[in-house]
Amino acid sequence: PMSLTLGLSGQPMSGADIGGFLFHADADLFGNWIALGAFYPFSRGHACAGTNNKEPWAFGKEIEEVSRIALERRYILLPYYYTLLHEASTTGMPIMRPIFFADPKDLSLRAEEKAFLVGDDLLVIPSFAKKTALPKGIWEDLSLVDGDKDGKYQAKLKIRGGSIIPTGKIIQNTTENSLDPLTLLVCLDEQGKASGSMYWDAGDGWSYQKGDYSLQQFTAERNGNKVMVKLVGKTGKRELENKGMAIVKVITKQGIRLASGNLTEGIEVGL
């Protein structure tokens, strides 16, 4: 609730110290915390002097593997988070959002304090949240890396119908090129359509203020047993390294359908 409230108060970059700043943490606490904390806007492990070690490897092989999977999910989602950071800086919208943002008229969502939204399109359900109030509509289960649906710690992810989420690859630090390749996760709504955007710039400095950025808009539309995904708009002077090339994954109840190509020309995915 603290991070959700901070977001609503105009402070989008927030997140509790993973493992807890004070007092000792055990393996079970840390496993649950890092699996959830990987989705905080501001995600870091931190501890006070005099407490036990709280590095991911300090709790044994199981928690080290839990931590690896959680952080790989985070790295894959960096293009989405970066886009949300741009939105927060220009509109004030929080990155981590209460569930009721998905449907403000549904009063049953107002009391939900465990599950939360990242942006409009990604729903995060912590492993310890046994009963959650979920928004109506299409929300498909989402797997990002091998093993992220196994065990008792990893948070469950759902992608909203009607959305396109930009993702990257597993990297070791944020200075590496996350967009080689760019992967778009597509989940169609009841009308067989979806849309999304991606913001990217140099990652440091102030050149974006002079137009050194790229803000791209994507659409997807189903026609029969095929889905066409296109780049439909772009602002900014920055040319991305992927040159319009991308992988598209259409998320359905029956599984993932995949294709690759150039977004400027359109990428067709068979269902």
Question: Where do the model's predicted regions map?
Answer:
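Catalytic-domain carbohydrate-binding cleft regions of carbohydrate-active enzymes
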Residues: 1-154, 158
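Solvent-exposed beta-hairpin/edge-strand motifs
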Residues: 132-144, 245-264
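A generic structural signal for beta-strand entry/edge sites
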Residues: 129-131, 154, 224-228, 266-268
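Accessory, solvent-exposed terminal regions and/or long lumenal/extracellular loops of proteins
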Residues: 159-260, 270-271
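Solvent-exposed, conformationally flexible loop/turn segments
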Residues: 150-154, 260-271
